[in-house]
């Protein structure tokens, strides 16, 4: 049995929010790819991914197969960690602090408390503050984002609708967060107090967000990105990087598409480069219309707002 991975997120170096958010800052301008085995992890790293997300199944297969989706097998996570040198993330269920404790013990670099897996607690998210490993959490709105940050999340991503190959929900969530930040910037101190109560978030976090004009932590896009153009669209909307899951390894040419997606993150403002890297990528993953989904994963959040 291999020893837990020694990484930048070892216990002696982490624990404070400043350190954890600093580790997330190192991923800015990058792409994080979902992988289910060592071979896929190798493809992702060789393509230029800044990190990989270790999963039992990609989101498209989770949707297709149904049932309860849980944390990946620790052996699979360790195999992926032993294969690549880039940071390795892994998902735990919403509210499942025991899964998070196991993942921290394995030595993963980040934990994603994810709505893609079946929620374990419909009233509480994991208290992320005591953990030494940084957490990633999804958000559809400024309120959701700041609630997760108040719980200790060091990185936010749009929820989108993973496994659909349809970017519409990720765009909606990115625009919603941007819109609500602009509203906050226009409010007086007294009005911000009322807005914080309306959103169900700590006043100090809302004040900091209004002053910065952006979330106080790294904000990536996720959920349904399947083409270089999708990546460019979200980057131009102001996110710091992207997660891509089923869109790569459910496509006709994963190796070429992975490299193209990496180029799209770097050259998101250059239509010529985007056109070049978009050529001959093979068939994209088969997409789903989000309005026809029987359940939207993005709606999975604990009921408490404080």
Swiss-Prot record:
Highest taxon above the source species: Eukaryota
Cited SUPFAM superfamilies: Ribulose-phoshate binding barrel
InterPro entries assigned to the protein according to its UniProt record, in alphabetical order: Aldolase_TIM, PdxS/SNZ, PdxS/SNZ_N, RibuloseP-bd_barrel
Chain sites annotated for binding D-ribose 5-phosphate: 34, 163, 224, 245-246
Record pathway: Cofactor biosynthesis; pyridoxal 5'-phosphate biosynthesis
The UniProt record lists the keyword Lyase: yes
EC numbers: 4.3.3.6
Amino-acid biosynthesis recorded as keyword: no
CDD domains in the record: pdxS (cd04727)
Annotated residues for binding of D-glyceraldehyde 3-phosphate: 175
GO BP terms: amino acid metabolic process; pyridoxal phosphate biosynthetic process; pyridoxine biosynthetic process
Gene3D superfamilies associated with the record: Aldolase class I
PROSITE patterns: PDXS_SNZ_1 (PS01235), PDXS_SNZ_2 (PS51129)
Gene Ontology MF terms in the entry: pyridoxal 5'-phosphate synthase (glutamine hydrolysing) activity
Family statement: Belongs to the PdxS/SNZ family.
Function, as annotated: Catalyzes the formation of pyridoxal 5'-phosphate from ribose 5-phosphate (RBP), glyceraldehyde 3-phosphate (G3P) and ammonia. The ammonia is provided by PDX2. Can also use ribulose 5-phosphate and dihydroxyacetone phosphate as substrates, resulting from enzyme-catalyzed isomerization of RBP and G3P, respectively. Also plays an indirect role in resistance to singlet oxygen-generating photosensitizers.
UniProt-recorded name of the protein: Pyridoxal 5'-phosphate synthase subunit SNZERR
Gene: SNZERR
């Amino acid at each position: 049995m291999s020893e837990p991975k020694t990484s930048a997120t070892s216990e002696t170096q982490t624990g404070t929010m400043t350190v954890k958010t600093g580790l997330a800052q190192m991923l800015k301008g990058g792409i994080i790819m979902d992988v289910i085995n060592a071979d896929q992890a190798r493809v992702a790293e060789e393509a230029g991914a800044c990190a990989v997300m270790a999963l039992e199944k990609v989101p498209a297969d989770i949707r297709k197969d149904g049932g309860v989706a849980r944390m990946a097998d620790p052996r699979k996570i360790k195999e992926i960690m032993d294969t690549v040198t880039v940071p390795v993330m892994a998902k735990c269920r919403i509210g499942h602090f025991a899964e998070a404790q196991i993942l921290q013990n394995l030595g993963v670099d980040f934990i994603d408390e994810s709505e893609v897996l079946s929620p374990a607690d419909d009233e509480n998210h994991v208290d992320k503050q005591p953990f030494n490993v940084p957490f990633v959490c999804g958000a559809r709105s400024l309120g959701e984002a700041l609630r997760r940050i108040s719980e200790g999340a060091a990185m936010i991503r749009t929820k989108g609708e993973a496994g659909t190959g349809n970017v519409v929900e990720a765009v909606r969530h990115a625009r919603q967060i941007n819109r609500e930040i602009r509203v906050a910037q226009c409010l007086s101190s007294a009005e911000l107090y009322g807005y914080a109560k309306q959103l169900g978030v700590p006043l100090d976090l809302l004040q900091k967000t209004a002053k910065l004009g952006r979330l106080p932590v790294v904000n990536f896009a996720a959920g349904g990105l399947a083409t270089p153009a999708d990546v460019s669209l979200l980057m131009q909307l102001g996110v710091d990087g992207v997660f891509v899951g089923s869109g790569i390894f459910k496509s006709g040419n994963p190796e070429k598409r992975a490299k193209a997606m990496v180029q799209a993150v770097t050259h998101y403002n250059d239509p010529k480069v985007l056109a070049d890297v978009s050529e001959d990528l093979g068939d994209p993953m088969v997409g789903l219309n989000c309005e026809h989904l029987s359940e939207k994963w993005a709606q999975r959040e604990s009921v408490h707002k404080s």
